[in-house]
Structure formats: structure tokens, C-alpha cells
């Protein structure tokens, strides 16, 4: 079937139809991977290292010491993943964080109902920050506004380019934001956990002898992964559900596993992280192409998720259950794959579900203004803003 006449239920694709060329090199020398089989082989192999998620920002942290877990490879990475895995298992998430998620959803949506209107992405960020802060251990800030300080890391002012004065300004802005985050949020949270360790990431890092700067670096990494991306996921799912009464009724009438399956299918269609970047550490043969050592490889998550070989017919239409676990799993590559697959996938699905079931039950829920779709360089994907909701 011609892809141009297939149903396309995506909201954030900027009108682009995924290419069906599985592996190709562009004029700049970057290799693009769009086929599921090639992408999975690359991500599950040991011939690449991480090359995305603001690696240059992390490298700017003065005296950062230990390599952040996001950028570790091989045995050290496997060991750190083993040690942090207990924070993210479905059983741990359900036992430790479900009551917190319910309280946060009640608070955020209660404020929305009292005011009669609210901005959806800000509500999603408040929810995401509250959950991730508890998991990481950023719960003892000197003042409110953790969400704004996290957002600031990935706002303008951190990109390379421009003249010398602009680069100096960018460096100063970045350092100021790092120091502000450290002194207001990270340092007091570390002090609280030195006095009384808890079941969270900061306590785990301190037990391993991490310094203040090393803990700061990990908090930036978890801030990006656990807060910024979850905000977009919540917002895009709400957009689909509020706009489609039948889909909303199906979601609210389903049991939890079926609701989770629908959210995972929406994430397959609308992956928050649009591209996974890797750099080869040795020559790699992929999809019949010979990729040299040191090459940049960009895995196009949108295209991979829409590969008919894994997602079947009409891959741009919503169809929960189309990708069973033995084939790829419902989100396909939306949470990555291989050693660096997102450990917080179940956390994100559960908190989105708890928030959305509460939000969608609000009487008279409607958009005053649908989301504006923009671009987020950190995740090489969409960002949704100015999504104003109203209720009765």
C-alpha cells in the first residue's frame, strides 16, 4: 500500500512519512537506521557507544569524576544497571510509588478543577517532577521551583554555535544553572541522605562514594530522562484521548493492563525520543551496509516503530496489541533497546495512567487551545506547549 494514503493518526510528526530505506548514509557522513531488524541488532550489539542526550553538557560539569550511568558501556554499565534496577521493577514501582502518584495526581488535578483551567504540559511536568524527585531523592530543596530549574538545563542558551561572545555567554549561563541546581536542590538532598539514607538513587550513589559533583551529574541525567520526557508523554496521550471521545471511553472502561497497552501504542506512534545516537567503536555491518569505526549512527525511532516488518499493516494507525512481547513489545523502540533501554519504562506508563484516569474523569474536560507542536533538541523530538484545558 502506498504510505501516502495510509491512515496517519499521529499528532507530532510534522507531516513527515517515515522512509522505508533501512540503512543509508547522508551527505554529512551520518548513518541513518530506519529498519527494526537493523536497529535492534545495533542497539543490542557491543560495537557502539552513546552519543546523544546532551553528552557535551555533561562533559562541561567541572571535575565530574565518574562517568554517568547513561554513558557507561560494557561491564561497568551492566553493574550499575544491576544496582539501580531495584528502584524500577514493576513490583517496586507499584509498592513504593503508586500512593505517591495518586496523591500527586489528586493535587495537580484538584488545583486545575478549582481554577477551572490549566496548561496541560505544566500539569504534566508537575506530576513528572514529583514522581522522579522521589525516585532520585531530590526531595529536600531549599526552595520550590525544581521543575523550572530542571527545565532550564534544556532551554535555549546551551547550544553550540554563534560568535565568541555568544559562546562565552552560553558557557556562563550553563555554569550558573548547574550551580543553582546543585546548591538549591542537590546539596541539601545529599545532606539529608547522609544523615538518614533512604531507598532512592542519591542514597545509592552516596553509598558508593560518589562526590557532590558526581551526584549532580547523575541528577541532571535522571532529570532529563525522568521528568522532561514523561511530561511530553503525558501531554501527547492526553491530546489523543481528549480529542477522541470513543478512544477516551475505551480507555476509561478498560482494566489497567488494557489501559497500559493503549498508552504504549500511543507511545509507539508518538515516541518522545525521536532519535537514538550511537558512535561506532569498530566497523559494523548493518543491513548490508559497511559502517566504519568512529561513524555517527542515528536510529530513527519514528521510522523503526512504523516498520511494517514489526508493526504490521497500517503502522501509522492506532492498534493496541499489534506488537506482542515476543516480536518487539508494544512500544517497539520508544524506550530504546539493548543495554541502554530505559529502566523507568514501567514507572512512566504507570504514572501517566494514574494521572490520565484522574484527569479524564473531570466533568466538562475540553481543550480551550490544542497543543503547539515544537522541537526539543535534547530528545530530537517534539515538545508540546500552550495546551490549555478547561472544565466545568
Residue ranges and their predicted role:
Residues 1-392:
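Cytochrome P450
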Amino acid at each position: 500500500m502506498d504510505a501516502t494514503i495510509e491512515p496517519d493518526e499521529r499528532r507530532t510528526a510534522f507531516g513527515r512519512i517515515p522512509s522505508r530505506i533501512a540503512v543509508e548514509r547522508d551527505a554529512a557522513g551520518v548513518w541513518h537506521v530506519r529498519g527494526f531488524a537493523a536497529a535492534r541488532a545495533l542497539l543490542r550489539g557491543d560495537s557502539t557507544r552513546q552519543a546523544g542526550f546532551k553528552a557535551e553538557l555533561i562533559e562541561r560539569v567541572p571535575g565530574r569524576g565518574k562517568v554517568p550511568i547513561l554513558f557507561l558501556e560494557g561491564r561497568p554499565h551492566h553493574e550499575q544497571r544491576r544496582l539501580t534496577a531495584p528502584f524500577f521493577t514493576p513490583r517496586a514501582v507499584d509498592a513504593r510509588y503508586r500512593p505517591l502518584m495518586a496523591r500527586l495526581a489528586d493535587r495537580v488535578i484538584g488545583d486545575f478543577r478549582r481554577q477551572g483551567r490549566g496548561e496541560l504540559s505544566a500539569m504534566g511536568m508537575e506530576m513528572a517532577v514529583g514522581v522522579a524527585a522521589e525516585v532520585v531523592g531530590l526531595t529536600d530543596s531549599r526552595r520550590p521551583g525544581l521543575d523550572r530549574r530542571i527545565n532550564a538545563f534544556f532551554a535555549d542558551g546551551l547550544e553550540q554555535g554563534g560568535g565568541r561572545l555568544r559562546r562565552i555567554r552560553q558557557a556562563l549561563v550553563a555554569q550558573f544553572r548547574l550551580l543553582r541546581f546543585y546548591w538549591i536542590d542537590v546539596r541539601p538532598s545529599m545532606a539529608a541522605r547522609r544523615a538518614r539514607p533512604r531507598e532512592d538513587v542519591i542514597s545509592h550513589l552516596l553509598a558508593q562514594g560518589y562526590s557532590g559533583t558526581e551526584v549532580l551529574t547523575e541528577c541532571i541525567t535522571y532529570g532529563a530522562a525522568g521528568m522532561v520526557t514523561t511530561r511530553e508523554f503525558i501531554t501527547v496521550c492526553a491530546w489523543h484521548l481528549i480529542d477522541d471521545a470513543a478512544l477516551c471511553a475505551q480507555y476509561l472502561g478498560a482494566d489497567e493492563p488494557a489501559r497500559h497497552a493503549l498508552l504504549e501504542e500511543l507511545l509507539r506512534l508518538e515516541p518522545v525520543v525521536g532519535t537514538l545516537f550511537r558512535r561506532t567503536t569498530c566497523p559494523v555491518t548493518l543491513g548490508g551496509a559497511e559502517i566504519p569505526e568512529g561513524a555517527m549512527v542515528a536510529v530513527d525511532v519514528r521510522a523503526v516503530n512504523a516498520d511494517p516488518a514489526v508493526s504490521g499493516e497500517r503502522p501509522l494507525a492506532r492498534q493496541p496489541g499489534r506488537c506482542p512481547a515476543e516480536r518487539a513489545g508494544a512500544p517497539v523502540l520508544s524506550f530504546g533497546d539493548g543495554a541502554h533501554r530505559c529502566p523507568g519504562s514501567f514507572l512512566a506508563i504507570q504514572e501517566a495512567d494514574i494521572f490520565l484516569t484522574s484527569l479524564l474523569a473531570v466533568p466538562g474536560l475540553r481543550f480551550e487551545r490544542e497543543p503547539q507542536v515544537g522541537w526539543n533538541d535534547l530528545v530530537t523530538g517534539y515538545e508540546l506547549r500552550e495546551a490549555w484545558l478547561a472544565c466545568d
